[in-house]
Amino acid sequence: NTFFKDETRPFAQKCFDGAYYRKAVSGKDKWLGIGGTVVLPQIEFDENRKNPNKPGQYLDNPSVYLGGNMGGQETDIGLTWEVVKESGVVSQERKAFRPFMRRTAHISGQEENYANAPAEERYYWYPGEEVAISIQIVDDYKLKFIVDGAGKRFETDYECAGYKKGNIGEFKRVNAIDQVANEGKPVQLT
C-alpha cells in the first residue's frame, strides 16, 4: 500500500451482517473524494433464492460502489443491479447496473435519501463493461458523482450535509452481494 506523508492510516472495522462484500476503507483524514476503475462482474444467480414478492428477481443483488462517512453522515454511491425501462415499461427482472445514491439522515435535519439515475438506456451498464466511478466534494455539503465507461456517462451533484472540504472523514470502495430484507442478520448461503 502507498500512504501519503502524515496520512492517518485505516484501522480494522467490524463487518456489517446481512451481505457478502469486499470493502476497503481509508483512514479518517481530510479527504476530498475517491475514485476507481472496475470491470463489472459477471453474474450467476442462485435459482433457489428467488424473491417471492417480486417475480423475476432474486434475493441476492450485486453492486459496486463508493461512499464514506463525514460529519456523521454515511453514503453509498455507485452502481447496483436494477430494473430497466423497455419500450416505456419497467422490467420485472433486474437487467443492468444503474447508478444509485444513498445517504443517511444528518443532524442538520437533512433527511435520508435513496435515488437512482433515470431508467434510460444511456445509464445502463452491463457485466464485463469497464467503468470509472468517482465521488468528490465539489462544494460544502455537495458531492459530484460520475460514472464513465463503455461510451456512456452519468454525472450529477448530490447534496450531503455532512460532507465539507477540510473536515475529517473516511471514504470506502465496496463490491457487494446485498441480500433482500437481510440487513443486520447472518448472511444466507447462496
Kindly label every feature range from the protein language model.
Residues 1-190:
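Exposed, interaction-prone regions of secreted/extracellular proteins
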